[in-house]
Amino acid sequence: MKPTIISKLESLKERHEELEALLGEASVISDQDKFRAYSKEYAQLEDVVKCFARWNQLNSNMEEAQLLLDDPSMKEMAQEEIEACKTEIEQVEQQLQILLLPKDPNDEYNCYLEIRAGTGGDEAGIFAGDLFRMYSRYAESKRWKVEVLSANESEQGGYKEIIVKVNGEGVYGQLKFESGGHRVQRVPKTESQGRIHTSACTVAVMPELPESELPEINPSDLRIDTYRSSGAGGQHVNTTDSAVRITHIPTGIVVECQDERSQHKNKAKAMSVLASRIVQAEKERQEQAQADTRRNLLGSGDRSDKIRTYNYPQGRVTDHRINLTVYRLDEVMNGKIDELIQPIITEYQADQLAALSEQA
């Protein structure tokens, strides 16, 4: 391992020890903000420090084994020990490289998840509902909380558009690769001839940024409309104009929120989504301007950016970014999507490592 990397790891180890001492001090324990910040930093360093300790232990074991090579009775055992250490050291060094990769500061945040029906009419709306259930079940398995902000239901079931907020630890980091076009191939329930139809939905994932990171929005740049919430009917349908639609005139971004019965609450939620969308749009514009030949596994949420196909007749799901196919469609639609998400994260980390190697 390079001396610069070892030096970096030593400084992280020292910081971890320093934080451990600080967390035991009365002045820190009594200051909740400071205690929370130090605890978070301590937890973030935990994995890399443990991994580095293992690396040091393996190198120490290998040095001890090398001292035994001159002893004929111990030579064979020492050689086996050295080979085993070399193999594990290689694995641990790969882990350390990944742990030292630059972190996306947004990864720890909650996120907004938007699902929109695209081409395919009613069937696209039904598929949007299927995707919403898939993500809801996945969130449930992770003990995350899903909060519906706005839902525009389609006539045959499902949604023309649904926007939700997902709350939990590391939510954006796990879901950010879901942005892009999702295509379904299946026989619709309304199809009498048994023909397979292709429909599509778009998914967009954005971090919920803290207030300090949100852009200042000029009130004169906004058009705010209020209207009555739409719903299936019955006693819970609003009779007041509590639903809110906000248009950001300079960018043309439109956000609707109708989940709360209070117009003020709906407006606050819509403003939060709008701010995140403005930040995301600017980020995508900058990334596009800086784009080089390296592929970008982070989808844009654009309809043309097809990332995944769900083929019902064959029971398969294919991720087109890394040519990954799994034949467990039922499990996937029931929320077991880690086997699709984790390979993308691994591939993304490999791309980051390759980029760092090129810069070195």
Swiss-Prot record:
Cross-referenced HAMAP family? Rel_fac_1
- From the record, what ranges are coiled-coil? none
**Keywords of the record:** Cytoplasm, Methylation, Protein biosynthesis
Q: Which gene encodes it?
A: prfA
Task: Show the InterPro entries listed in the entry.
Answer: PCRF (IPR005139), Pep_chain_release_fac_I (IPR000352), Pep_chain_release_fac_I_sf (IPR045853), Prokaryotic/Mito_RF (IPR050057), RF-1 (IPR004373)
Name recorded for this polypeptide:
Peptide chain release factor 1
Entry-linked Gene3D superfamilies: 3.30.160.20, 3.30.70.1660, 6.10.140.1950
Where is there biased composition of kind Basic and acidic residues? 284-295
Provide the residue span(s) of the region labelled Disordered.
284-309
What is the native source organism of this protein? Pasteurella multocida (strain Pm70)
Q: How is the polypeptide modified once translated?
A: Methylated by PrmC. Methylation increases the termination efficiency of RF1.
- In Gene Ontology terms, what is one molecular function of this protein? translation release factor activity, codon specific
Q: Name one GO cellular component term.
A: cytoplasm
Return the similarity comment.
Belongs to the prokaryotic/mitochondrial release factor family.
Q: Where in the cell is it found?
A: Cytoplasm
Residues modified as N5-methylglutamine are Q235
UniProt function note: Peptide chain release factor 1 directs the termination of translation in response to the peptide chain termination codons UAG and UAA.
The answer on whether this UniProt entry bears the keyword Cytoplasm reads yes
Q: Which Pfam families match?
A: PCRF (PF03462), RF-1 (PF00472)
